Amino acid sequence: WYSSMFAANIKQEPISHHHHHHHAHHSHHAHDSNSNSNASSPHQSPLPSPNPPSHTNLQLEQYLKQQQQQQQQHQHQQQQQPMDTLCAAAMTPSPSNNDQNSLGWLVGLPNPMQTIMPANMRPSPTATTATAAAAAPTTTAAAIALQANDKLQALTPPMDVTPPKSPAKSQQSCAEPEKEHDLMSNSSEDMKYMA
């Protein structure tokens, strides 16, 4: 499809180029003399000149269509073969499953599900608590850094505004870990309840 579009674009370009070229010639000849313009008009031969490209267009289009059809046929054949094999493969195990494994699967499925679900639920609280615990040190480290910054600011107060700022920052930094700890305890308790 892309090749046909590309070929069509290539063919359209020379035709337009041809027309522009001939029009330029036509005006030039008209300036020279009417006889030359008349002689150049058959020399232009606008009807025959597009005809051979259109003819090749048709041939190329037919050729491309044939190629596309062949490709589609090949694709269909390739698709049909795996589909047949897949259908056969799906059909052949399904009776065996129904005969042999269906009861075993029905009996066996709930037990693995029951064992899998708590197993899935158990790691998730540990993961959440681990992430919360990992988040808590970062917040406490940030709070320590904030407190250190506040201490530095308190040690070297460049302005009178910094001392009132530092206690507010320290209060916020102190409150942040508490919030984190509350969230941690709540999440862990919720996960315990969930488990």
Swiss-Prot record:
One Gene Ontology CC term in the entry: nucleus
Segments of skewed composition (Low complexity): 33-44, 66-81
GO molecular function: DNA binding; zinc ion binding
Keyword check for RNA-binding: no
Signal peptide per UniProt: none
Localization per record: Nucleus
Bias type Basic and acidic residues, positions: 176-195
Region span, Disordered: 16-57, 64-83, 155-195
Keywords annotated in UniProt: Developmental protein, DNA-binding, Gap protein, Metal-binding, Nucleus, Repeat, Zinc, Zinc-finger
Biological-process GO terms, alphabetical: segmentation
UniProt biased composition (Basic residues): 17-29
Keyword Zinc-finger assigned: yes
Family classification: Belongs to the hunchback C2H2-type zinc-finger protein family.
Known function: Gap class segmentation protein that controls development of head structures.
Identification of the protein by name: Protein hunchback
Organism: Drosophila dasycnemia
Annotated gene: hb
